[in-house]
Amino acid sequence: MEDFKDFTEVTQFTNVQYLGCSQLVNNDNDNEMKALMKVLDEQKGAQTINVTLVVPHNISGTVKLIDAQGKVLSSFSLVNIRFCIRGESSTSQNNCFGISFTHKISVGEHNSSDILHQCHVFRTSKAETAAKALYSFSYAFSNKNVSSESNRLEFQFESILEVKENDGTVEKPSWKLCPQHNGVFKVRRDREKKIVVQLRQIDGFLLNIKKCFGMLLAAGRNLRHSDLQLLEMDRNATGTDSAVFVIEANWDPRVHMFEVLNTETPRDTRVFMTVAIDVIVSEISEPIRFSMEAMSRVFHEHERFYKTPQTVVSEEFTLVLEKSCDQSDPNDRKLTFISLESDSDRKRSKQNLGKSPSRMPTQLLHPTGDDESDCDEPLLSGSGKVSQECKEEHLEMWDQLIENWDQQSDRPQKISELVLDGIPDKLRGRVWQLLSNVRILAIDQPDLVEKYHIFLSQPCPSEQVIMRDIHRTFPAHDYFKESQGKGQQSLYKISKVYSLYDEEVSYCQGLSFLAASLLLHMPEEQAFCTLVKIMFNYGLRDLFKLGFDNLHLRFFQLTALLKDYIPDLSHHLEHIGIETHMYASQWFLTLFTAKFPLQMVFFILDLFLSQGMNTIFHISLALLDDAKTDLLQLDFEGTLKYFRVSLPRKYRTEASTKCLIHKAVKFRLNHSKLEVYENEYKRIKELERENEDPVLRMEKEIGRHQANTLRLERENDDLAHELVTSKIELRRKLDVAEDQIETSANAIERLTRQNMDILEENKNLMREYEQIKEMYRRDVLRLEENGSRAEKLLAEYKKLFSERSKRAENEREHFEVQKKAIIARISDCDKCWPAVCEWEKNRSPVHSASTPTGPDLLTKLEEREDHIKNLEIDLAQTKLSLVEAECRNQDLTHQLMAQSESDGKKWFKKTITQLKEVGSSLKHHERSNSSVTP
C-alpha cells in the first residue's frame, strides 16, 4: 500500500508502481498519453517495480524515482515537465497518472531533432493518491519565485473562537459561554452575544500585534469581503501571555443582516458562519485578515442547555513573510506579506483533488466564484417561487374543462396533454381532487370526513415523531415557517389522523412533505381525503409496508432501467460505489417533494396524479440523464453531494422544470420491462432465501433487530432529553407561579390591612364630617340672622335719614323764603339795612358754630347720605362674600363626599382650615357691619 509523506522541501509517495517510460511524438497530446498509459497498464506484470516518487515543493527542484534499496533510478528537473494527465475515471486506468517532460540530448543545441519527449506512467492502489500526486506537481509549479525562498519566513498562529450570551438582563448582564459540540455552537435567538477571538502565535520569532481594527461576521462560508458585517469592538488588547492577543466584539443578532443566524434551525440543520479579524502587525507593512468558519444551531430564546465539557473551536494558520532585499535603509525592517493559509483550506484543497476530472491541468486550484458562495448548502424544502401567471384564454379553457368534468364521470382525453405544461396554480386543488377521484371516495366512504374529526380527538402513539417532522417540513415557505402557526397545526392534524386511519402503515417520515403540498392548495378535510386516495389508489403506501420490500423492488427496477437506457452512467455509479437507494429513496417515498423547488414539486405531482406510479421512473431517468455529464466526473462523496445540493438547484426556474417534464414524458420507456424486472427480483429473492445460510439469516435478523434497537434507543434518548427539558421548563414555570402566588398572597394581605385602616379612617372622617357639617349649619343660621338684622337696621337708618333729609330741606326752603321776605321789606329802609348788613358781618362766630345754619345742615346731610351709600356698598359686599362662602362650602362638601374614601387626614385638615377661614371672614364682615351701626 502506497503512502505519501510531506516534508519541508519535498513530498514522497512510497509503494507507487512504475509502469515504465515511452517516447512521445507530441508532449501536449493527451489522447496519445492516454493510449500509452492504457498499453503500459495492460502490459504490467511481474517486472513492474515499486518506487518512491519524490516531488519537490518549488519549480527549481528535481523529481526523483527511488527503488526499494534507495537507489535513484531516474531524475529530471521539474521545469522540464510539460503536461500532467490522469486516467479516465470510468476505466481501469482511474488509478494511473502520467507526466510528460522534454529531454535534451545535447546541451546547447536547440533544434527539434535534439529534443526528446518522454512520458512516465505510474499506478497507485487508490485514485485519491493519484490525485494528491498531481496536486503536489501543481503546488510545485505555483512556487515560481525561487530566488526568494531563502528570504521567506513561516509563522504559525492558532485562533480560538468563543461565543458568549447574555443570560441576564439589559441592566444587569450576565455573560456565559455558549456550549458547543463537534464544532457546532448552540446559541439562542434574540439574545445579545459577544464574539471572542484569541489569536496565539505558536511558532516563529514573536511578532508584535499592535491592534485589531475590525471584527467581521456573516452567515455562510466561502464569502466575499463585501458579505461580512462589521461588529462593534469591545476589547482589543494583548492578554496575560505576550503571545496571545484577545479581541472581543458585541453582536446583536436581532439586526436584519444577521437574520439567518437568528432564526431557529431544524434539528438536523446547521448554519455556517464566518468570523474574520483584521490585525495590524508592527513588522508587516500591510494589515492581515484571519478568517475562521464555524457552525451554529439556533434554539428558542428560553432554551436550557445541559452542562457539557468545555471544548474550543480553533483554527491554525500558516503565515508566510518575506524579508526585504533592499538593504539601503537599515532602519526599514518591514516584512512583506506573501500568503496566509489555514489548515482547513489546505485540507479542503487536498480533498477536492479526488473530485477532479481525468485530465488534470497544472492549475488545479482556483478561487470560488461569486455565484458559488452558497453551493455547499442544500435548498430548504418548500423554497422557490410558484408562477401565478396564466393567460386568460388558457384559464377559461381549464374552467370549461373542469365544468364538463364535474358533470361527467369520465376523465377528459385532453387532460393528459394539458398537464404537460402544468396545471394553473389557482386550479390545482380542484384538478388534483378530480385526477385522484376524491368524489368517488366520498361515495364509497361518506363518513370519512366525520372520521377525520373523530380521530383528531384521539391520542396518537406517533405524536412525538410527527411533531419533530413538521418543523422540518417546508421551513422555507411562509405558511409553514411559523412555529405552532396555522400551517404547522393543519399539517400536524393531517399527519396524526392518517397515522390513526391507516394502522398498518401508521406514520412514516416523509409523509408530511406530500401532505404539505396538498395543504397549499386545499382545506384540511379535502387534503386528507386526497392523501388517502393517493396512498391507497396509487400504490404509494405499498412502499412503506413489509419492511420496505416494495421500495427495494422499485430500486431494483430503476437500477435495471438505468443499465438499459444510460449504461455509461450506470457503470460509473457502480464503479464508485453509489447504490440506487442512496439517492432515490426520497424520490419514491416523498414524490420528489422533500428537496426540490416548489415549482418542480407541483409539476411532478400534476404528472404523477395524471399518469400514476410509472411517472417516478420517467422523472428519475430524466434527472439522471440531465446530470450525466456532471456525475461522470465526480467521485463517491462528490456524487452524494451533487444529488443533495447541486441537482435541486438546477430546476429553480419554471423553464428548466418544464424542460425536464417534457423530457421525462418523451423518454421512451418500455413499461413491460417493469413486470419483467419485478419477476426477476422476486426470483432473485426466492433464490436468496433458498440458498441463504440459516446462520447468516439469523445474523442479518439480529443485525436488523440491533439496528432497530439502536434506533429505538436514539429515539428514547431524544424523548428522554425532551422529557427532561420539559420537566425543567415545567419546574421553572412552577417556581415562577409559586413565587407569583406568594407575592400575590402578600400583596392581598397588605391590601387587606390597608383596606381595614382606610375603612376605620373613613368612619372617623365621616364623624368629623358630620360635626363640621353641623357646625357649618349653625354658623350659616347665625350669619343669616345677623344678615337679616343688619338689613333691618339698614332699612331703619335709611328711613330716618330720609325723614331728616326731607325736614331739613323743608326748613331750609322755609328759611330762604323768610329771609328773602325780610330782606325785601327792609331793603328800602336806610336805617335798617345797614344794621342788617352790620349784623350779618359782625355775627358771633361761636353762635354760628354752635348754631348750624341751613348750608351747614345741608353739608352734614350730604355727608350722612355719603355715609349711608358707603354702608350700602359694604352691605352688598358682605352679601356677595356670603354667597361666595356658600358656593365654596357646597364645593367643599361635594369634594369631601367624593374623596372621603381615598383622601387622608391632610386633605380633611385642609378643608377644615378653609372652612375656618370662611367662617372668620364672615365674622370679620359681621364686625365691620356692626361698627358702622350708630
Curated annotation (Swiss-Prot):
PROSITE patterns: PID, TBC_RABGAP
Domain PID intervals: 16-134
Example GO molecular function: GTPase activator activity
Family matches, as InterPro entries: Kinesin-like (IPR022164), PH-like_dom_sf (IPR011993), PTB/PI_dom (IPR006020), Rab-GAP-TBC_dom (IPR000195), Rab-GAP_TBC_sf (IPR035969), Rab_GAP_TBC_domain (IPR050302)
Top-rank taxon, per record: Eukaryota
Reported phenotype of the disruption mutant: RNAi-mediated knockdown results in increased expression of the lin-41 protein, which is a target of the let-7 microRNA.
Pfam families: DUF3694, RabGAP-TBC
Record's compositionally biased regions (Polar residues): 351-361
Keywords, in A-Z order: Coiled coil, GTPase activation
Sequence segments annotated as region (Disordered): 337-383
Coiled coil: 727-800, 861-895
GO biological process: cuticle development; RNA localization
Keyword NADP: no
Known function: Rab GTPase activating protein for the small GTPases rab-6.1 and rab-6.2. Probably acts through rab-6.1 and rab-6.2 to play a role in microRNA-mediated gene silencing in different tissue types. Required for seam cell division and alae formation.
Name this polypeptide is given: Rab GTPase-activating protein tbc-11
